Amino acid sequence: MFYEPEMNAGVAETLMLENRLHRAIEQQQFILHYQPKIESATGRVVGMEALLRWQDPDCGLVSPAEFIPILEETGMMLEVGTWAMRQALTESRAWRPMHGGPLRIAVNVSPVQLEQRDFVDSVRRAIDGLDIEGSPLELEITESTVMDDVDENISKLAAIRDMGVNIVMSDFGAGHSSLPHLADLPVNALKIDRSFFATVTTKSHSMTLVSTIISLAHALTVIAEGVDSADQAKLLRLLKCDEMQGNLFSKPLSADGVAKFLQRASVPR
């Protein structure tokens, strides 16, 4: 096999990024931003999705697309993922007085986390000693990740839900079909993949698919992500979608930004 200079440069760049990420963990350079989830019928803020960000002191905010794959490939995501759960729950405590009710806090779970044998215990350790009643924890796991080993994952997710943690299956409809298993999956909510909403107001096929998904999941909470226009929001309300999330309502916010958002929350309708 012949190696081109470009290949060597690529390997060196990856190794350098790995070293920077190790340093980022040691120096606590990771932060969380949050995007609100809105109840469609009332416009009320009902939750926040925590989004991992890397605040590099030299480069500023680094795109998640650049560093999350490396965290997953190297196994560093196990440590960072546990930190994200605790950090999100800790930061959310400050929002309770200004919100006036339970505010669900969603944290994304990567495939490498879910496949760990001790994943259930790691979640238990992450929430140990934290009050999750006022800010219930949600774990968002993609449909394709759940379906990779559906029988094993059903067992893990059921054990986690028994702790009082909600399970959201995200990117629903984008990959492996979970419909045959939907009745058996211990999930509280489905988050419909954002690809459906790019054309939901212009193509009848997209609208039919979204309407069908909402109807099939009538016993679950259905969340639409990637809602960026008032027309999309209006149609989703007509289709009885339970919750919405997207830049129409708010771009991802810092923890301080969430506090300000909740104080002046006035959601576009």
Where are these regions (language model features)?
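C-terminal helical cap(s) of enzyme catalytic domains, especially alpha/beta-barrels
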Residues: 21, 237, 253-269
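Active-site core of bacterial EAL-family cyclic-dinucleotide phosphodiesterase domains
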Residues: 1-70, 108, 169, 224, ...
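Catalytic core of bacterial c-di-GMP phosphodiesterases, primarily the EAL and HD-GYP domains
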Residues: 4, 10-12, 40-49, 76-152, ...
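Structural preference for long, well-ordered alpha-helical segments in enzyme cores
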Residues: 17-20, 24, 50-51, 66, ...
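The catalytic core of metal-dependent phosphodiesterases that act on cyclic dinucleotides
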Residues: 105, 124-200, 214-252
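Conserved N-terminal phosphate-binding loop of PLP-dependent enzymes in the Aspartate aminotransferase
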Residues: 209
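Conserved ATPase "switch" residues in P-loop NTPase domains
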Residues: 25, 96, 161, 266
